[in-house]
């Protein structure tokens, strides 16, 4: 078969297959063109999930007649001169408009700000109509109808109208986050679905518009520089997490990307703080010399290639971990919101309340009896909190002292322990409820990790060794890693077939459930299959030990023990969540409590 030159229409249709995969791809290209034109207001209208209609209107610089004629021709662009090494605009390929025009019905109306009138041009399945004058406001309106009507086979690969509309919505959200000074409006066939007013330079306000005000309340600012690569943005506290990674946004030199390296770095930064199956919320913006990143490795420009990927990953992981450590005692405010929503009024109006005879015997209420909220019996010593930074508070008094300053601490002053598991503390503007086991577990883990890194993890010799019966294969695995476990203060040895003798345990754990600890460690080592050693997993082992050595649920604490726990939480990084990523405390503001009682 002879080789022949392809027609211009077929070439454009092939290009469309690379650049325009779905309506959202077309929307992305058109929005990028509007942003490159300096628009401050962009309106997107769709019908049929973008297949029947996609219209993008902007108030940008506009085009004159000559520019309009070139805009629908391949490889014509105002954004690229001679090199691909210094790309500073969003769109640059010079293929989007002719590619769209080859598979759809495309019309463009545009007018420059300094022109008295505008012009319009149309492209129908690759056939360009004559340019004509048109009434138009300054800016550009691009309208795409019947996308892929010229290539019906492509329609089979599109998803439902709802799914395609959702993809367009996601594109608009990403663009809106990247450009807070631009007003974005997205409307469907019958209503406005999104509207993001311009917020100027206030990036966090725009993120609150897109991600919700909960993100603003639970975000930690990022600002780091490494070898002329800067990282800014916001990362959610670990307890503010989601069931998927859809709430992770990354931008490189202002360009929205979905780069695997960046997403992997975000996961790595949160690896020890979020439960399995949950994902952090983060918005990252990386700025670097355009020569250090290739944005042309993918037709849709969604992936990039960094010249030094290790440097970028290290910058992201380090910046997020440093921010979490700096503000690590915070827990997500959404816990309080969820709790408030779960409350229901516990009374009935007088008119609806059944009238029954009342007696002291039948009433669910009991006469008032003064109580301090604590057990009056002597308590065991709080061995688990023997860390030097913990400060004991004065003995609790049911009558608040005039000079009570403990409520001025971020986590307040302990007022009661309920169900022998939760500490209720009073702050200056509300109250805090702390899960004592989860909180102490995190404190012990952080102390163990610090001691592990400094090689000063002390152990305590058991007066009588604990003998733990486990399967022979588990014995073999544990003994294979006995030296590494000894680094954590856990000394074990064989004690006959199917048995392990525990002779030493980490001193900071106090009294340890050796049987439960050994069995869980055996299960985890089997799951990890770490034949080469536990060195990469020592912190996970420390987390397991911390869980077994922390204050258990059901243990009653004295007031000074509870206040010592609160003070230690305030100075410990990551204390807002336990080792499994669950929150260690929930804060209720006084305004929230008053709202529950209808006093707002």
UniProtKB/Swiss-Prot annotation:
Family named by the database record: Belongs to the DNA mismatch repair MutL/HexB family.
Q: Region Disordered: start and end of each range?
A: 348-375
Tell me the InterPro entries matching this sequence: DNA_mismatch_repair_CS, DNA_mismatch_repair_MutL, DNA_mismatch_S5_2-like, HATPase_C_sf, MutL/Mlh/PMS, MutL/Mlh/Pms-like, MutL_C, MutL_C_dimsub
Q: Which residues form a coiled coil?
A: none
Keyword list (alphabetical) reads: DNA damage, DNA repair
Q: Does the keyword DNA damage apply?
A: yes
Q: Does the keyword DNA damage apply?
A: yes
**What is the official name of this protein in its record?**
DNA mismatch repair protein MutL
What's a single GO MF annotation on this record?
Answer: ATP hydrolysis activity
Q: Please give the SMART domains that the UniProt record associates with this protein.
A: DNA_mis_repair (SM01340), MutL_C (SM00853)
Query: Per its database record, what is this protein's job?
Result: This protein is involved in the repair of mismatches in DNA. It is required for dam-dependent methyl-directed DNA mismatch repair. May act as a 'molecular matchmaker', a protein that promotes the formation of a stable complex between two or more DNA-binding proteins in an ATP-dependent manner without itself being part of a final effector complex.
């Amino acid at each position: 078969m002879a080789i022949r030159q392809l027609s211009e229409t077929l070439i454009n249709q092939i290009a469309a297959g690379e650049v325009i995969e779905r309506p959202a791809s077309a929307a992305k290209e058109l929005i990028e063109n509007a942003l490159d034109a300096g628009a401050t207001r962009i309106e997107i209208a769709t019908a049929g999930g973008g297949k029947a209609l996609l219209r993008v209107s902007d108030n940008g610089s506009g085009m004159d007649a000559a520019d309009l004629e070139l805009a629908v021709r391949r490889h014509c662009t105002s954004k690229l001169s001679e090199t691909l090494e210094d790309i500073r605009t969003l769109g640059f390929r010079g293929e989007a408009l002719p590619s769209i025009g080859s598979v759809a019905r495309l019309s463009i109306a545009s007018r420059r700000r300094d022109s008295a009138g505008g012009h319009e041009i149309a492209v129908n399945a690759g056939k360009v109509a004559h340019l004509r004058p048109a009434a138009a406001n300054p800016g550009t309106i691009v309208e795409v109808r019947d996308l892929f009507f010229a290539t019906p086979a492509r329609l089979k690969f599109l998803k439902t109208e709802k799914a395609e509309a959702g993809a367009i919505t996601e594109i608009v959200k990403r663009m809106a986050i990247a450009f807070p000074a631009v007003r974005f409006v997205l409307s469907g066939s019958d209503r406005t679905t999104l509207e993001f007013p311009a917020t100027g330079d206030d990036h966090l306000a725009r993120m609150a518009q897109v991600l919700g005000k909960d993100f603003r309340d639970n975000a930690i600012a990022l600002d780091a520089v490494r070898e002329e690569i800067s990282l800014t943005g916001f990362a959610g506290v670990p307890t503010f997490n989601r069931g998927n990674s859809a709430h992770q946004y990354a931008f490189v030199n202002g360009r929205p990307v979905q780069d695997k390296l960046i997403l992997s770095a975000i996961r790595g930064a949160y690896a020890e703080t979020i439960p399995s199956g949950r994902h952090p919320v983060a918005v990252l913006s990386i700025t670097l010399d355009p020569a250090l990143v290739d944005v042309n490795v993918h037709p849709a420009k969604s992936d990039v290639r960094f010249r030094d990927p290790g440097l970028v990953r290290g910058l992201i992981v380090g910046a997020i971990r440093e921010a979490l450590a700096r503000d690590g005692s915070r827990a997500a405010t959404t816990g309080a919101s969820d709790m408030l929503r779960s409350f229901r009024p516990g009374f009935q109006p007088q008119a609806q309340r059944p009238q029954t005879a009342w007696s002291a015997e039948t009433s669910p209420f009991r006469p008032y009896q003064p109580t301090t909220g604590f057990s009056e019996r002597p308590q065991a010593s709080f061995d688990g909190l023997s860390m030097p930074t913990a400060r004991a508070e004065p003995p609790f008094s049911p009558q608040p002292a005039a000079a009570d300053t403990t409520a001025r601490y971020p986590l307040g002053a302990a007022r009661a322990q309920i169900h022998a598991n939760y500490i209720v503390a009073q702050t200056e503007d509300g109250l805090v409820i702390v899960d004592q086991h989860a909180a102490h577990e995190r404190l012990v883990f952080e102390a163990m990790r610090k001691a592990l890194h400094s090689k000063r993890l002390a152990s305590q010799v058991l007066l009588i060794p604990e003998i733990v019966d486990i399967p022979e294969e588990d014995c073999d695995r544990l003994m294979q890693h006995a030296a590494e476990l000894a680094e954590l203060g856990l000394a074990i040895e064989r004690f006959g077939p199917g048995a392990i003798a525990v002779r030493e345990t980490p001193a900071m754990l106090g009294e340890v459930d050796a049987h439960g600890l050994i069995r869980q460690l055996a299960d985890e080592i089997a799951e990890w299959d770490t034949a080469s050693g536990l060195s990469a997993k020592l912190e996970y082992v420390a987390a397991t030990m911390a869980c077994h050595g922390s204050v258990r649920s059901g243990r009653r604490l004295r007031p000074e023990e509870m206040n010592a726990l609160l003070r230690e939480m305030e100075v410990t990084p990551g204390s807002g969540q336990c080792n499994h990523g669950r929150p260690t405390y929930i804060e209720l503001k006084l305004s929230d409590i008053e709202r529950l009682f209808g006093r707002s």
